[in-house]
């Protein structure tokens, strides 16, 4: 029996966590990967599936965000990407894409090639972009 596209997606997300994001401190929560700091800054990478997915294909994009805990606010270790002060799509900041982009999994897709493509955008674009922000104040200074 061939693997479903949903199973292929889940396996891909688990591998991305294990090999790319977990070594940098991100914790997995479904399709969300978060890292929280004691200084009130949180970072999230979210894999958003298309609402139009079907059994034959699974499209997804990569969202990212910078969360800032407000003074006097209780910490929220399960913040969502839409809770963030700064939000961006991974493809928007990548010189390779520069626009909205949705990756697609389908029967026969070369998953090793797809993993390599995602690993590249995460390590070359997303994580370095996020590393520019080390504190809440860095996010506030961006004016976003």
PLM ranges: what are they?
Residues 1-9, 14, 28, 35-144:
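Intrinsically disordered, low-complexity regulatory regions enriched in serine/threonine/proline
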Residues 18:
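Short glycine-/small-residue-rich flexible loop motifs, especially phosphate/cofactor-binding loops
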Residues 21:
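Pyridoxal 5′-phosphate
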């Amino acid at each position: 029996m061939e693997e479903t596209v949903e199973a292929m997606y889940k396996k891909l997300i688990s591998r991305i966590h294990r090999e790319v994001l977990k070594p940098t401190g991100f914790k997995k929560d479904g399709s969300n990967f978060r890292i929280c700091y004691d200084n009130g800054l949180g970072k999230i990478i979210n894999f958003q599936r298309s609402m139009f997915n079907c059994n034959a294909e699974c499209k997804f994009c990569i969202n990212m965000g910078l969360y800032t805990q407000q003074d006097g606010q209780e910490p929220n270790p399960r913040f969502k990407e839409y809770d963030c002060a700064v939000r961006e799509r991974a493809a928007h900041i990548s010189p390779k894409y520069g626009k909205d982009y949705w990756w697609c999994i389908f029967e026969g897709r070369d998953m090793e090639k797809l993993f390599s493509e995602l690993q590249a955008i995460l390590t070359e674009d997303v994580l370095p972009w996020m590393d520019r922000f080390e504190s809440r104040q860095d996010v506030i200074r961006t004016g976003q």
